[in-house]
């Protein structure tokens, strides 16, 4: 873990963000591996339009690694925060997913009848939206959140500030 602080990418990031003169520390978190049926990313502020009244959720089958790595194109859902209303749904065909198999992660093929189905129901989109809003309010800044859905329950596996916004929100 400590060596990751000294990679060129990490050093450049700290200089770019003005953090090169601050003390740096590393925390190690141990958490349960969630065998997610569906997983994804959520942004508490729309990352493209930077509209602070919209959040965006991306969802795909299996583990979130497939989305984070860019290996699949996830569904995307835009929610208007103050009205708690879904205003846009884009469903992507997903042919494969990463799943936990013993000690490894493996790619599996998605059944043809499920490939073009909306990954999260509208009800679940709104439920996850509430969690995203609570996390943003808790931290007091726009958040980039990784989530997993297993056996009817959402798990938040990571939350961090959105660092790409140009506007100050």
Give, region by region, the residue ranges found by the protein language model.
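Conserved mixed alpha/beta core segments that line enzyme active sites in large multi-domain catalysts
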Residues: 1-169
């Amino acid at each position: 873990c400590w060596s990751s602080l000294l990679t060129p990418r990490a050093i450049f990031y700290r200089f770019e963000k003005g953090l090169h003169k601050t003390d740096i520390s590393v925390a190690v978190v141990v958490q349960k591996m969630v065998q997610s049926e569906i997983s994804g990313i959520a942004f508490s502020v729309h990352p493209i339009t930077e509209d602070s009244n919209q959040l965006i959720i991306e969802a795909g089958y299996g583990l979130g690694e497939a989305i984070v790595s860019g290996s699949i194109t996830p569904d995307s859902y835009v929610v208007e925060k103050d009205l708690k209303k879904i205003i846009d749904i884009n469903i992507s065909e997903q042919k494969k997913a990463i799943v936990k198999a013993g000690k490894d992660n493996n790619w599996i093929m998605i059944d043809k009848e499920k490939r073009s189905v909306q990954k999260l129901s509208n009800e679940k989109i709104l439920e996850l939206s509430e969690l995203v809003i609570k996390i943003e309010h808790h931290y007091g800044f726009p958040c980039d959140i990784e989530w997993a859905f297993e056996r009817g329950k959402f798990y938040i596996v990571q939350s961090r500030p959105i660092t790409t916004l140009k506007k100050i929100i």
